Regions:
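Bacterial Sec-dependent N-terminal signal peptides
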Residues: 1-29, 418
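Short hydrophobic "helix-edge" motifs at membrane interfaces and signal-peptide entry regions
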Residues: 5, 33-41, 217-218, 335-337
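Residues embedded in well-ordered secondary-structure elements
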Residues: 9, 13, 65, 119, ...
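Primarily auto-inhibitory N-terminal propeptides
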Residues: 20-100, 104
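Short, surface-exposed loop/turn motifs at beta-strand boundaries within globular domains
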Residues: 69-71, 123, 173, 347
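Extracellular (secreted or membrane-anchored) zinc-dependent metallopeptidases
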Residues: 76-86, 91-136, 147-226, 232-334
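Phosphate-/polyanion-interacting regions in eukaryotic proteins
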Residues: 142-143
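C-terminal outer-membrane/trafficking sorting elements
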Residues: 336-344, 348-418
């Protein structure tokens, strides 16, 4: 029997441009879902009771101890949806975000030194790691990064980004991968499904501006993805989405509401005891610089979802991190006429031609042209082996042409417009 935790709380971490403060609307979303399907309330209670029974049966003598069980490794595919070249974040940015996730879940980040002394005894190495996939659903080689240019300027929280039919990108099989979509969400920082939702919607959506280390004030260290990954693994907000609510974790103090900004010292609410609120927990909405721990209780709750009968269990036998069975190479009849792309004529007056017959893997990628000042001028989608671009409207001068591919290959050419 397969036990499901249905996606009832899509967690919206909303960052106001005016106040630079994240505000969550998950409670309103939950109320609407329960109104649409009242029977879900009973179903949630039954499933949560099963989780609590499972947790009781596990060893709880873990406080303050390093992780000693097997490390869970989660295959990740990152879908990058971009409308402009500036939104097409680099592979390095993706690697950076994966590093932040691993440091946070393994308690290896340097800012763990900022955890208050009175909470250090329950601060957990969760024994969970994230790795970019090496095999795609067809067992072909992959970098674990998908790039797709889209006509959509800004996405909402309606999950359209998760469907190619809506100009988004279809999810890879969620029984084998964690899907992360990166796109322009406007003022929204990110949101996540909970375990057990529809497989085609399962995963995390992160705003381009807060993915990896960025310039977004207050949320520039990649912690938004850490927060949303916590939701994806079954954690609630630390204040339980209501005044002094329940997050279903025993060792997190009761808290009156989310925490704004980056406080310090002891802040007490809900009779949280002499140590006060745990506003430095990743499941609060504190700014990135002030979040630095998951607790032992949160660790155990996340890891129980990988046990038999729970939806994340299939990830333990995923083929996503196995060596690919198929390594794609161009068919014989499409082998290159030469060993590198050709750009001609150069100089040019009204049209340039980029011949990419040397490698069909450039199909579907985007050509970007900038001027000598680095300003973006124009772009064109590669939909044939030979691409012609009209440059009649360009001012005379030197220009740079760039095409990037998921595997790190890059075409860089320069040309002169007469």
């Amino acid at each position: 029997m397969r036990f499901l935790i249905f996606t009832l709380f899509i967690n919206f971490a909303i960052t106001s441009k005016l106040s630079a403060q994240r505000v969550c609307s998950s409670f309103d979303y939950k109320e609407q879902e329960l109104k649409n399907s009242p029977s879900l309330n009973t179903r949630i209670d039954n499933i949560e009771n099963f989780i609590q029974q499972k947790l009781i049966s596990r060893s709880t003598n873990i406080a303050g101890k390093p992780h000693t069980g097997s490390v869970i490794k989660i295959p990740v595919v990152v879908h990058i949806l971009y409308n402009t070249p500036q939104q097409n974040i680099s592979d390095e940015k993706v690697f950076e975000q994966i590093k932040v996730l691993n440091e946070s879940f393994r308690r290896l980040s340097s800012d763990t030194a900022n955890t208050p002394q009175w909470f250090k005894s329950i601060a957990a190495d969760c024994g969970i790691e994230f790795q970019l996939a090496t095999s795609d659903p067809q067992r072909k080689n992959t970098s674990g990064i998908i790039r797709k240019q889209t006509p959509v300027i800004q996405w909402g929280t309606d999950d359209q980004v998760k469907f190619s039919a809506k100009a988004g990108s279809d999810a890879w099989d969620s029984q084998n991968y964690l899907n992360i979509w990166v796109c322009n969400l406007g003022i929204v920082a990110g949101y996540s499904s909970f375990p057990g939702g529809p497989t085609e919607k399962d995963g995390i959506v992160i705003g381009t501006g807060v993915f990896g280390k960025s310039s977004r004030a207050g949320y520039n260290m990649g912690k938004t993805a850490v927060h949303e990954a916590g939701h994806w693994l079954g954690l609630r907000h630390i204040w339980g989405d209501s005044y002094c609510g329940d997050d279903w974790v025993d060792d997190t103090p009761k808290q009156g509401n989310f925490t704004a900004g980056c406080p310090s010292g002891i802040r007490a609410s809900c009779s949280s005891g002499p140590n006060g609120d745990m506003y430095m927990n990743y499941m609060d909405l504190t700014q990135d610089a002030c979040t630095n721990l998951f607790t032992d209780g949160q660790k155990e709750r996340m890891r129980v979802f990988f046990e038999p009968g729970f939806d994340r269990h299939t990830l333990l036998s995923s083929y996503g991190l196995l060596p690919p069975l198929i390594t794609e190479i161009p068919p014989v009849d499409q082998l290159p006429k030469w060993d590198h792309p050709q750009l001609y004529p150069n100089p040019a007056t009204n049209e340039i031609t980029l011949d990419l017959s040397n490698d069909i893997r450039w199909m579907g990628k985007t050509i970007s042209i900038t001027n000598i000042q680095g300003q973006f001028i124009m772009q064109s989608l590669i939909n044939s082996k030979v691409v012609k671009m009209n440059i009649d409207n360009l001012q005379p001068g030197l220009y740079f042409l760039v095409v990037k591919r998921e595997d790190g290959a890059t075409v860089k050419q320069k040309f002169i417009k007469m």
